[in-house]
Amino acid sequence: RPKKCIFVENLIDNAMYIRKIDKLLLDWKNYEDRKPLVVRGCRQCGKTSTVISFAKKHYKNVIYLDFHKEKELCTIFSGSLNVDYLVVLISAAIPSARFEEGKTCLIFDEIQECPHARASLKFFKLDGRYDVICTGSLLGINGYSTIDSDAFIPVGFESAINMYPMDFEEWLWANGIQDSVIDILKHHLEEETPVPQAIHNSMRQLLLQYIVVGGMPDAVKTFLATHDINRVLTVQRNIIEGYKADMVKYANPTDKNRIRECFESIPRQLSKENKKFSYSVVRKGARSRDYIGSLQWIEDAGMIHRCYNLNITELPLSGNAIQDSFKVFMADTGLFISLLDEGTQFDILHGKLYGYKGAIYENIVADILGKMGRKLYYFHKTDGIEIDFVFRYKGECTPLECKARTGNAKSLNTLLRHPEKYHVNNAIKVGDYNVGRAGSVLTIPLYMGFLLTAL
């Protein structure tokens, strides 16, 4: 019989952070005809602690099964998936488990490790007495497994939501910034008026720290407890090593080296003047057909955001994307900075974001937009026009330029002078300055990027 599960209280960090996914979890629970829920995301983005904390707040009984640490638990699901039968086996394995209709939540952690448990979600849905929340790494959930897990996916009997590392707004909450301060920022964005200098300086400093620390909860926790960047860097590098361990665990043997080469090329890709992803930077003479699957693997792991070039700046953006022309950004700014040269953190904390040919600026914008769940696009033409990002904002196709220093944006001006050709009427520049407007161009400080949510 499986040994007793770790008691659930031991898995919750006392210093829990407010996460935006909490609202999605509550919306799910309040939906009468809810299905078992799968929370998927990259490794160590806070899935387990968030789900356990939520369940303990909203259910009388929480039953936790970790299929990664206690693989014997999978034997519970190796036979009949009848819910009454499973209740008997789970109760035997976990004597503290209590099953009460409408008051019990089962948490299946690392569900990709036990495909039969995932298959049981259909039966829990049809039974309807107990809620089930699962967590899963993107790799396993997307079918990268040593076993044929696709056959066990209960199509139509589960819901899924994505979870990301902490974004800048969650970082502000973790640092004790109240919503009243964020409301002030929103007001100045809407009115297009400068943020008061004291708030501006504070937000700017918090952003510099966020660029270095990023949103991985362990890195955030370490920084807030110690303010020791070297300790934060150790945490970040351990997370990176965990990703590399996943490459060994999940990837086909023939792909492992190629995946690692693709991943390790990202800083070199972004430090180029032209940041379009080039397979020859991965390895001299490399061809796209040899590496395209490896890059997809990294994307499916939640480690990167792909940013596609556009044929034309016109909605819908997805219909105008060039599939074989793209940039690759790290999904979390802190992990990206941890891959750069020693001392980069020191430079950033002192306001020096100009290095790597603008890569730090572009990657933080990719971090901000990507953690909103947005797809990323840019615009680059052979005639010299290049726009860092293009996104839908307030119903319009909107170019977004990120500038480390103030200056004329020639490409932006070209687009705005020819709306009949480029379908652009307004643009946004983010950089190290306050809110302002010059004609059709709204300038905002980089720390305000998280407020650009309007579709």
Name every feature range the model reports, one short phrase each.
Residues E70-G102:
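Short glycine-rich substrate-engagement loop in P-loop NTPases that contacts/grips substrate
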Residues T50, F54:
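Hydrophobic positions on the alpha1 helix immediately C-terminal to the Walker A/P-loop
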Residues I107, D131-S137, N162, W171:
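Structural recognition of the conserved hydrophobic beta-strand(s) that form the central parallel beta-sheet
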Residues K3-N30:
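N-terminal pre-Walker A segment at the start of P-loop NTPase domains
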Residues Y31, F391-P399:
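Active-site beta-strand-loop-beta-strand hairpin of nuclease catalytic cores
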Residues K221-K394:
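Accessory nucleic acid-recognition modules appended to NTPase machines
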Residues K47:
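Conserved lysine of the Walker
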Residues G143-S271:
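Interdomain motor-coupling "hinge/lid" segment immediately C-terminal to the ATP-binding subdomain
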